[in-house]
C-alpha cells in the first residue's frame, strides 16, 4: 500500500458506474479523512445538519486509527466497490 495506490483509489471511486449506498459512502468519506487529515479536528455539526453529523460521527469513530491503516481500509473498500458497482 502506497500513497500512489491511495491516490489512484481516490480517483477510481469517483468513476463508479453507480453511486454506492449511504453507509458505503460514509465508510469511504471517514477513511479518506482519517488518512489525509488524521483524527477529527472540528466540532460536531448542529442538530439539524443530519448529513454533516453522520459524516462527523463516522470520522470520529476512527479516532486513533493510523494513516496507514485508514489508507489500507480505504483502498480495500474501493476495490470491493469497483467489483460491486463497476468502473
From Swiss-Prot:
GO biological process: fatty acid metabolic process
N6-(2-hydroxyisobutyryl)lysine carried by residues: 55
Residues bound to an acyl-CoA: 14, 29-33, 51, 55, 74
List of residues that carry N6-malonyllysine: 55
UniProt keyword Transferase present: no
Keywords: Acetylation, Endoplasmic reticulum, Golgi apparatus, Hydroxylation, Lipid-binding, Phosphoprotein, Transport
Gene Ontology CC annotation, any one: endoplasmic reticulum
Residues recorded as bearing N-acetylserine in the entry: 2
Modified positions (N6-succinyllysine) in chain numbering: 8, 17, 55, 77
Keyword Ribosomal protein carried by entry: no
First-listed, main subcellular location of the protein, grouped into a coarse class: endoplasmic reticulum
Localization (cell): Endoplasmic reticulum; Golgi apparatus
Pfam families registered for this protein in UniProt: ACBP
Annotated positions of the Phosphotyrosine modification: 29
General function of this protein: Binds medium- and long-chain acyl-CoA esters with very high affinity and may function as an intracellular carrier of acyl-CoA esters.
Family per similarity comment: Belongs to the ACBP family.
Protein name from the UniProt record: Acyl-CoA-binding protein
Organism, as annotated: Chaetophractus villosus (South American armadillo)
The organism's taxonomic lineage, starting at the top: Eukaryota, Metazoa, Chordata, Craniata, Vertebrata
Gene: DBI
